[in-house]
Curated annotation (Swiss-Prot):
Gene3D superfamilies linked: Metal-dependent hydrolases (3.20.20.140), Urease, subunit C, domain 1 (2.30.40.10)
Cofactor: binding details: Binds 1 zinc ion per subunit.
Protein task: Catalyzes the deamination of 5-methylthioadenosine and S-adenosyl-L-homocysteine into 5-methylthioinosine and S-inosyl-L-homocysteine, respectively. Is also able to deaminate adenosine.
Lineage: Archaea, Methanobacteriati, Methanobacteriota, Thermococci, Thermococcales
Catalytic activity: S-adenosyl-L-homocysteine + H2O + H(+) = S-inosyl-L-homocysteine + NH4(+); S-methyl-5'-thioadenosine + H2O + H(+) = S-methyl-5'-thioinosine + NH4(+)
HAMAP family associated with the record: MTA_SAH_deamin
Protein name: 5-methylthioadenosine/S-adenosylhomocysteine deaminase
Alphabetic keyword roster: Hydrolase, Metal-binding, Zinc
InterPro entries (UniProt xref): Amidohydro-rel, Deaminase_MtaD/DadD, Metal-dep_hydrolase_composite, Metal_Hydrolase, MTA/SAH_deaminase
């Protein structure tokens, strides 16, 4: 299968210099980017009024939690979890997780997301939804043992079961990831088991880290050390680890994460909404930490719009430091694209020959996007999810002219109309 995108304005390579050109895709790869490509293709897409960008990578979310959008509002994280989310989750059935994931995946398609890192339960259902929609998912069972040996055995069994299930799928798009929930909800024995299996299975790991001051206090009381130091003791600090949030990190913590090549998945909307704190972005970047971007779940965001996430990530740092130059648009865009690809060991996240054909096309015929003096700044500060017109994932057109081609979107929407009040 070949696709030819004609005449688009492209944010090419990592310089993001706007270039008017064509893009030829063969199979799942970008094979040519230049003006006036005259080769035949199975599908030709007119992109003459479009901005063409690498598709986004959502480095931290909980897709089925879209079911709880708006359920718990104006409360801090621990209250949100213990009194609202965890009780509601205990009632969830497999079928509900499947439909919730499908709704979330549709929202991510319209946000221009090709790839997401997901932590939840009943992940076989999320895998099924992911394959049907056609996105790329790194799926992990969220392990929580709370120092209970019997529960730890159950969590290990569930994780092994998911690993076997995804391995047997042998899919290019659905990948396994180990997903211990957090250092304060997982015992040291559980974390050490995860580290061991990460090496044995050559698996990536995702975990919540230093999200709140309460977490820091819990870890100090329990271990006399920071959460980062506990992860080091568990042998989890390495380039396979994607740590979500990373708000309450000391200089020593940042240095340890940097020297271990850990990725931090920054989730500004969730952090702001739950009053968790502000990620020390400049300090992390200056330590040469790979910072990616995540939406977190729609229960705490309350959207999966990663364009809005880029905007919030930039604005939050500017106002917090009273410095409009504290972070550049190029740095923010990298977080949502190539930095996520680096964390996931994917040759993706940029538009360049030889890279995976994960591409989002933005319709520029929108009043809020014109005039176009600076395409990258316009994308971050003016665009929104609904501006994504076409999405290509691994060389396959998932959405064209705003219409999702892989599943019946109306059927999914109808499933949730009337749910709530």
């Amino acid at each position: 299968m070949s696709i030819l995108l004609k005449g688009g304005l492209i944010l090419y390579d990592t310089s993001y210099h706007p270039t008017r050109a064509d893009i030829l895709i063969e199979g799942d790869k970008i094979v040519e980017v230049k003006r006036n490509i005259n080769k035949a293709a199975d599908e030709v897409i007119d992109a003459s009024h479009s901005l063409i960008i690498p598709a986004f990578i959502n480095a931290h979310t909980h897709s089925p939690m879209v079911i709880f959008r708006g359920l718990a509002e104006d409360v801090p994280l621990m209250d949100w979890l213990q009194n609202y989310i965890w009780p509601a989750e205990r009632k969830l059935k497999r079928k509900e997780v499947y439909w919730g994931a499908k709704l979330a995946l549709l929202e991510m398609v319209h946000s221009g997301i090709s790839t997401f890192v997901d932590m939840y339960f009943y992940m076989e259902e999320v895998a099924r939804a992911t394959l049907e929609v056609g996105l790329r998912g790194f799926l992990g069972y969220g392990m929580v043992d709370l120092e209970d040996e019997e529960k730890r055995r159950k969590e290990i069994k569930e994780t092994e079961k998911l690993h076997e299930f995804i391995t047997k799928l042998n899919s290019k798009l659905v990948k396994f990831i180990l997903a211990p929930h957090a250092p304060y909800t997982c015992s040291l024995d559980c974390l050490k088991w995860v580290a061991e299996k990460s090496r044995e299975w050559d698996s990536l790991v995702t975990i919540h880290l230093a999200e709140t001051r309460d977490e820091i206090k819990i870890m100090e009381e329990k271990y006399g050390r920071s959460p980062v130091e506990v992860l080091k003791e568990a042998n989890l600090l390495n380039d396979k680890l994607i740590a979500a949030h990373g708000i309450w990190l000391s200089k020593k913590d940042l240095e340890m994460l940097a020297s271990s090549n850990v990725t931090i998945a920054h989730c500004p909307a969730s952090n702001m909404k739950l009053g968790s704190g502000i990620f020390p972005m400049r300090d992390a970047i200056d330590e040469d930490i790979n910072v990616a971007l995540g939406t977190d779940g729609a229960a705490s965001n309350n959207t999966l719009d990663i364009i809005r996430e880029m905007r919030l990530a930039s604005l939050l740092q500017k106002v917090n430091t009273l410095n409009p130059a504290i972070v550049k648009s190029e740095e923010i865009f990298r977080m949502a694209t190539i930095n996520g690809a680096k964390a996931l060991k994917l040759k993706a996240g940029i538009i360049k020959e030889g890279y995976i054909a994960d591409i989002a096309v933005i319709n520029l015929k929108r009043s809020h996007l014109l005039p176009l003096h600076n395409p990258l700044a316009t994308l971050i500060f003016s665009a929104k999810a609904g501006d994504i017109d076409t999405l290509i994932v691994s060389g396959r057109v998932i959405m064209l002219d705003g219409e999702v081609l892989t599943i019946d979107e109306e059927k999914v929407i109808d499933k949730f109309l009337g749910v709530g009040i």
